[in-house]
């Protein structure tokens, strides 16, 4: 509606809209494929059969209109004519977001694209010089409040930044998400002391966080995780296994999800620790006592590296319990 009102809704925007609507409509009505063996049907999301019947003809019309060979052929022709563009059609971004997009596009073209293929082939870390430049662009504090050194921009800005940096190399595009996860957790649930300690340094990139959630045999079912943290005086002692942890070697702080109350099943027994650790390298990935791990070699998504991690008596100060309460 905005693009139409401003006279910016042309043929390519219309075709992109109806093609996308057809794709989404087909998935929502027929089932959203979560994996090769799992499909979420509308009924599973609480949609009644009467509501499904009420809208199924309209959805079928949308799917049919956007799935024709003519639509696909014309859209392909228009995209071909725009070869070299980073986006197709008018994105509808306002002036601020358009400036962010252009800034990230230029950085990606100049600093990332020329080197990305070599980083991938050699399975190398993204150089710290690039990480520092990403920090200087404000990426790590993009959505944090100004009082903590952030830029106080919205989630849409983070989407734009992640998308444009990922166009150069997916690992660079994901750098900011580690800080985004930690920043969101600490900002919304941390004590005032934890916010003051971690958020400003996260915003500048002085602290690189990593999310340590998933475990073998549980995957994204975080309510079933088993890694234990037992409080002994003013310290938590952590024991357990984690897997598919992104960029843990060079991280300074782990947002470490653990079970502090084994009597409570599911989410109620879980707590989050802000677990500090020294940075490692390929020769000595985890110098911290009570922490070991091995790299998970992957075909793609390189640059930060994935790891299995084992904790055996790894200690975290009790004051680093997120929010101060289990």
Say what each PLM segment does.
Residues 235, 239-289:
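A short core secondary-structure module
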Residues 133, 221-239:
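Cytochrome P450 C-terminal beta-domain/meander region
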Residues 108, 138, 145, 161, ...:
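Buried hydrophobic positions in well-ordered alpha/beta secondary-structure cores of metabolic enzymes
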Residues 281-313:
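Flexible, small-/acidic-enriched active-site or ligand-binding loops
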Residues 174-193, 219-222, 235:
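N-terminal glycine-rich flavin-associated loop
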Residues 205-213:
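A short, Trp-centered hydrophobic/proline-enriched beta-strand micro-motif
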Residues 1-122, 127-148, 152-155, 159, ...:
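Flavin-dependent oxidoreductase catalytic core characteristic
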Residues 217-220, 244-247, 262-264, 298-305, ...:
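Short Gly/Pro-enriched turn/cap motifs at secondary-structure boundaries
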């Amino acid at each position: 509606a905005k693009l139409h009102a401003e006279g910016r809704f042309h043929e390519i925007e219309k075709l992109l809209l109806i093609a996308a609507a057809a794709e989404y409509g087909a998935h929502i009505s027929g089932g959203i494929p979560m994996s090769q063996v799992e499909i979420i049907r509308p009924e599973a999301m609480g949609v009644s059969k009467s509501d499904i019947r009420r809208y199924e003809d309209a959805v079928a019309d949308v799917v049919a209109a956007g799935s024709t060979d003519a639509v696909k052929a014309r859209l392909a022709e228009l995209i071909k004519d725009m070869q070299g563009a980073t986006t197709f059609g008018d994105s509808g971004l306002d002036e601020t977001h358009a400036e962010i997009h252009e800034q990230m596009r230029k950085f990606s073209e100049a600093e990332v694209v020329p080197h990305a293929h070599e980083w991938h082939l050699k399975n190398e870390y993204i150089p710290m010089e690039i990480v520092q430049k990403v920090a200087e662009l404000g990426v790590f504090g993009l959505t944090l409040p100004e009082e903590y050194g952030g830029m106080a921009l919205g989630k849409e800005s983070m989407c734009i930044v992640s998308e444009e940096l990922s166009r150069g190399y997916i690992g660079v595009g994901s750098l900011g998400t580690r800080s985004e996860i930690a920043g969101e957790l600490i900002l919304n649930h941390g004590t005032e002391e934890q916010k003051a300690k971690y958020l400003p340094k996260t915003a500048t990139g002085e602290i690189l966080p990593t999310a340590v959630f998933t475990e073998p045999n549980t995957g994204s079912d975080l309510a079933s995780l088993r890694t234990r943290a037992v409080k002994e005086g003013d310290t938590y002692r952590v024991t357990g296994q984690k897997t598919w942890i992104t960029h843990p070697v060079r991280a300074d702080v782990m947002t470490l999800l653990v079970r502090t109350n084994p009597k409570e099943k599911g989410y109620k027994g879980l707590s989050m620790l802000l677990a500090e650790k020294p940075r490692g390298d390929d020769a000595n990935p985890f110098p911290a006592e009570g922490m070991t791990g091995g790299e998970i070699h992957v075909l793609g998504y390189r640059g930060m590296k994935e790891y299995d991690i084992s904790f055996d008596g790894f200690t975290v100060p009790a004051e680093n319990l997120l929010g101060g309460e289990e």
